[in-house]
Design a protein with these regions (language model features):
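Conserved beta-strand/loop positions that form the S-adenosyl-L-methionine
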Residues: 1-4
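Active-site alpha-helical segments that house and flank conserved acidic catalytic motifs
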Residues: 7
Length: 250
């Protein structure tokens, strides 16, 4: 379940890399973002051929393997009395589910984010369903770099409410535990991931593409973004088996 998926093509890249993968992929984004995405898929035969059937609407797509939900994510927060939650076709409440947020939830108020996650873990999914989450967000708002970043964004009327609420890796871990991901809650900044997870061959490949002359500036930038991942095992330890040994930053 990819939140605020935008123009991301991960579903198609996964199909290319793992053609036999048993996967049901969901994306949620504003209709203004899903409209050009579906139009792009329809224009390109290489993408269109990977769908089980052609899109029948301009902003949404639903099939047994790929789903694009044209929704305001905030509509999944605690609904008003008498207002039902949106339907998410083809979301099986019993299948192990991974929720992805790459610079999406950071734009919402923390209480709204908590409500959205709770809606997934208690309404759309059964409480016994193995469920996990991966967040990619900025951190460290209070040092010089962080203050400058916030100031620059505010000049464009952009605010990141969760940045100051969860400023460090420990805060991100506690956040995930508070969401109910009690079997695992880990985090690492992207500098750690670059140095510890990425092979030397891959680093050399990227360096040749990007011409990374200012390594210190890169590392400063990487320290201000993080991945946080958490899970609940439910009826199965599928995520503990998959992620239990993934090295985090301590």
């Amino acid at each position: 379940m990819s939140l605020g998926a935008g123009t991301d093509t991960r579903f198609f890249r996964l199909l290319d890399a793992y053609p036999d993968l048993r996967l049901v992929y969901h994306e949620i984004d504003f209709p203004t973002n899903t409209l050009p995405k579906i139009a792009c898929i329809q224009r390109h035969a290489a993408l269109r051929r990977k769908l089980l059937h052609a899109p029948t609407t301009s902003t949404s797509y639903h099939s047994a393997t790929y789903n694009i939900h044209a929704l305001d994510l905030r509509s999944l927060a605690a609904p008003s009395e008498g207002v039902p939650l949106p339907e998410l076709p083809n979301l099986d409440p019993t299948l192990p589910t991974l929720i992805l947020s790459e610079m999406c939830l950071v734009y919402l108020q923390p209480q709204t984010v908590q409500s959205i996650i709770s809606t997934f873990t208690t309404h759309y999914l059964k409480p016994t369903t193995p469920t996990s989450i991966v967040l990619y967000e900025p951190i460290l708002p209070h040092d010089a770099f962080g203050r400058t970043m916030i100031s620059n964004l505010e000049t464009r009327n952009i605010r990141l409410p969760t940045l100051t609420t969860y400023p460090g890796l420990g805060d991100q871990r506690a956040r995930l535990s508070g969401y109910g991901f009690t079997n695992g809650a880990k985090a690492a900044d992207t500098e750690f991931i670059w140095k510890q997870w990425i092979s030397e061959d891959e680093k050399e490949r990227v360096a040749s593409l990007e011409m990374l002359d200012e390594l210190e500036e890169l590392e400063l930038l990487l320290r201000h973004y993080c991945f946080a991942w958490g899970w609940r095992d439910g009826e199965s330890d599928v995520f503990s088996k998959a992620w239990g040994d993934v090295r985090e930053q301590v």
